[in-house]
Each structure stands twice: as C-alpha cells, then as structure tokens.
C-alpha cells in the first residue's frame, strides 16, 4: 500500500479526523499541514501518536519529522535543528528534496493538472534532474510556505538553465474573493504571461484555484510574487513597485533574484518591462526591513529625514553582509524571511552562524540612542509583544534571543511605520539586558519618559563598559 494511503488508513482506524491529506501520486512524503479538523497546526502529541502508531521506515519517519517541524516552526526551531542533525547522522546528508523515480513524479505540460503540496520537492527534483523535462513544461503544485530549500533550488535552476523559459505555477488560495480572482485574470491576460489555468485540487475538495507566482524569465530572473492571504505577507504596493523599478534600473549587470510581496497584482504590469530587460537584484518589501544587494541602493532609498540616517544605513548594511555570508547565494528562502520577521534570526542557517554585536559596538549603539533621546526629546518604547508599535520615532522590541530597533520618520494614525528602517539584532545577552530593566517602564503601554529612557541607556552603557574593564 502506498505511503500516504497507509497513513490515512492508520489515522482513520484511530478515529483521527482527516480533512486534507495529499496521497495522490505515490509520493513518500505527506502533507501534515491542515490535516486535523482543518487546523493549521498539528499538536506535538498527535504527531508523536502518528509516528508511534505505524512502523515507518527511517526515511519516512525522517520526512514526517521534517514536515511537522517545518510547519510548526514558530514553536519548534530547536527541535527542527535536532531533527536535521539526526537525519544527517543517520543518512549522511540532509536532502533538500526527495529524488523519486520519474513514473512517481507529477510533471506535466501546460494543459495538464496535478495537485498537492506534499509532492512539491519530488516534482521539482525530477524536473531539475531530467534535462528533457526542462523545455516547455509547467509544474502545477499547491506550494508549501514552509519549505526551506525550495527557493534556492529554483534559483539554482534559473541561473543554470541554458536559455529555456520555464514556468512553475503554484496555487494561490484566495479565500473565495471573487474580485481578486477577476483582477488576477485580467492582469495575466493583459500582460500575456503563460496561460492562466484553473487547478482542480483533490486535497481541497475539487475547488478551483487561480495560479500565479514563480516565473523564470529567460532563465535569468526569478520573480516570486505571493498573494497568499493566509500567510499575511502583505504590505504597501506603491513602495514595492517603485523599488522593483529602481532595482531594474540600477542593477543591469546583476545575475541575482528579485522577490517581492504586494497587496495588488495589478501593479505587476508596471514592472514587467524593466524586469524582462534586465537581470534584477534581490529585494524584499514584505517586512519593514528593506533588504538590498547594494549599499548604494540602500543609501538612495533610506529617506533623509530618518533619524541618524547614516548610522542606520551602515548598521543595516553590515547586518546584511553577515546574512549574505551565511546563506547560499546571499538570499533568504521564504522560511528564512519568516524567521527574520518573527524571531530576528536573519538567516536560513542556524543561529550560531550569526554573531552577536560586540561590546564596543553596543556602547556605540546605546550612545546613538541616547543622543537621539536627548536631542529630539524622543520617548523610548520597550515591548515584549509580537506587534511593532511606534512611540514618536523610536521603538525597541525584545525577543527571547534578540531585539529589534525601529527608526521611523513618520507615524500615521494607526501607529504604523512610514519611511522607516527596521533593524533586528540576534543577541540573547543584549536582549536580557533590556528585560532586566523592566522596572523603568513607568507607563502601562510600556513607554519610557525621556528621563527614564536616559537612565536605562546609561545603565546599559555602564554594564557594557564594566564588561570591557573587567577583561
């Protein structure tokens, strides 16, 4: 019996309700995302129950562990690293995808329909390994947003594929928004991308979904453009379009990747011409941090009225260089971007590859903060929540293993940043320094008055100087 069917049978026999399980094409992976009662997360107890109920092979168990911990990454980052380490010790390598016999792989032409996020790696693997399949083919897949290796695989293929224009489409679940679907269809019709097909996906009960997303333009540029509402990768569209156009103009000779997320796909048509003309650098505007591949573009983009602009540019550029040195091709996968946004770990690599800020640089950083507080009468806000809110122009957000600083030139009525720059530091020790001074938080919303902000910063500087003086 095929692996997915066996798992499905096991779940059924144990009265575990299954609402989605991709077992269509004999793949040795199975999607655990949204399997139980339509939930988006699978409890660890239920997951262990699955592993213990059926006698999986080591390879199957390893794949299940990978899927589970990827799809619950917010809670299980350390477990994920342990699983990958265990896999490395067991098999001798960490596989970015499974390489299965071609007869078990769903590879199709433009008129064919295939389904299932569980098959994503396998289809891509076979597709990339078979040169004959790399011409005039389309892979349709229900894209998994927690795949670590997918972006790098596609990037490698895009820059190495000699002259073949290949289109990979993935499903975009629009939540029944007819208006967005119609807008999508109009955009793709007008710009004449590939045919826009409906996908009948067995794992979604046969509902039709529109597709768009990862495009290989002349095997030189990858545009990964996601309007997946459920993942919340939405941000202001005008800045994105402007930035894409800027990148296209400024980086004519670059052979890199551009990634962008935007609320409205209507703006895609505004950026097509420069993108097809030039090879474009990697950008991300999904999160307040604007990540650029050249310091010049970063300098030209950070507005003049951003507080201590030069320091922001230099610090962010140094941060980006560390990220680029620890990730393949100097870019993030989608998972890497999610972790960057959520946890301050700005890399797909494990945290030990990112170095904390030196004590000397901490002092410089704190003195800059104090200068801003004193000169501009800024308040300072320390938060332990997930949401970033701004008081005046300046905010600090604390994480368990790091902290972030938001420099903002303007604040609107919803307390959202406008024209700001957001820097995240992975530094558990420094994060603890902040949390140790929670007694300075004198207002219920966490805002520090100017007086207490100065006291806090002075104490932090004093601690750093003490470390240096004590050797």
Regions found by a protein language model. Name each.
Residues 45-101:
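Short amphipathic recognition helices of helix-turn-helix/homeodomain-type DNA-binding modules
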Residues 1-20:
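A short, Lys/Arg-rich alpha-helix, primarily the initiator
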Residues 12, 23, 52:
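Alpha-helical residues within the helix-turn-helix
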Residues 18, 29, 44-47:
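Helix-turn-helix DNA-binding elements, focusing on the entry/boundary residues of the two helices
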Residues 20, 31, 60:
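Residues in the helix-turn-helix
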Residues 109-466:
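Hydrophobic protein-protein interaction segments
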């Amino acid at each position: 019996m095929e692996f997915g069917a066996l798992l499905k049978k096991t779940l059924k026999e144990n009265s575990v309700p299954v609402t989605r399980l991709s077992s269509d094409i004999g793949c040795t992976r199975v999607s655990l995302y949204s399997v139980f009662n339509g939930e988006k997360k699978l409890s660890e107890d239920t997951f262990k129950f699955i592993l213990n109920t059926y006698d999986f092979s080591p390879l199957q168990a390893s794949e299940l562990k990978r899927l589970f911990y990827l799809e619950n990454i917010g809670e299980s980052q350390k477990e994920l690293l342990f699983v990958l380490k265990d896999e490395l010790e067991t098999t001798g390598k960490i596989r970015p995808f499974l390489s299965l016999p071609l007869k078990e792989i769903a590879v199709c032409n433009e008129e064919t329909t295939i389904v299932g996020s569980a098959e994503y790696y396998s289809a891509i693997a076979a597709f990339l390994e078979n040169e004959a399949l790399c011409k005039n083919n389309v892979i349709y897949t229900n894209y998994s947003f927690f795949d670590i290796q997918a972006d790098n695989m596609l990037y490698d293929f895009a820059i190495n594929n000699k002259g073949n224009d290949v289109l990979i489409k993935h499903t975009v679940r629009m939540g029944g928004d007819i208006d967005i679907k119609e807008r999508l269809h109009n955009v793709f019709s007008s710009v004449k991308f590939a045919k826009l097909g409906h996908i009948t996906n067995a794992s979604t009960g046969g509902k039709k979904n529109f597709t768009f997303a990862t495009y290989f333009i002349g095997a030189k540029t990858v545009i990964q453009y996601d309007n997946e509402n459920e993942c919340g990768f939405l941000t202001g569209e005008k800045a994105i379009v402007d930035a894409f156009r800027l990148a296209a103009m400024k980086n004519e000779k670059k052979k890199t990747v551009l990634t962008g997320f935007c609320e409205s796909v209507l703006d895609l048509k505004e950026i097509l011409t420069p993108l097809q003309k030039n090879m474009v650098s990697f950008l991300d505007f999904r999160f307040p941090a604007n990540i650029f591949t050249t310091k010049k573009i970063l300098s030209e983009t950070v507005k003049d009225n951003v507080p201590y602009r030069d320091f922001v540019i230099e610090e962010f550029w140094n941060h980006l260089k560390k990220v680029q040195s620890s990730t393949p091709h100097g870019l993030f996968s989608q998972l890497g971007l999610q972790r960057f946004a959520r946890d301050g770990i700005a890399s797909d690599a494990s945290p030990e590859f990112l170095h904390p800020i030196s004590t000397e640089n901490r002092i410089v950083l704190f003195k800059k903060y104090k200068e801003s507080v004193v000169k501009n009468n800024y308040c300072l806000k320390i938060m332990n929540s997930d949401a970033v809110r701004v008081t005046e122009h300046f905010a600090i957000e604390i994480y368990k293993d790091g902290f972030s600083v938001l420099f903002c030139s303007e604040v609107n009525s919803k307390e959202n940043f406008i024209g700001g720059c957001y820097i995240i530091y992975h530094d558990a020790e420094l994060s603890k320094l902040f949390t140790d001074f929670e007694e300075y938080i004198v207002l219920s919303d966490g805002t520090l008055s100017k007086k207490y902000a100065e006291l806090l910063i002075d104490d932090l500087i004093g601690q750093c100087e003490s470390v240096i003086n004590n050797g």
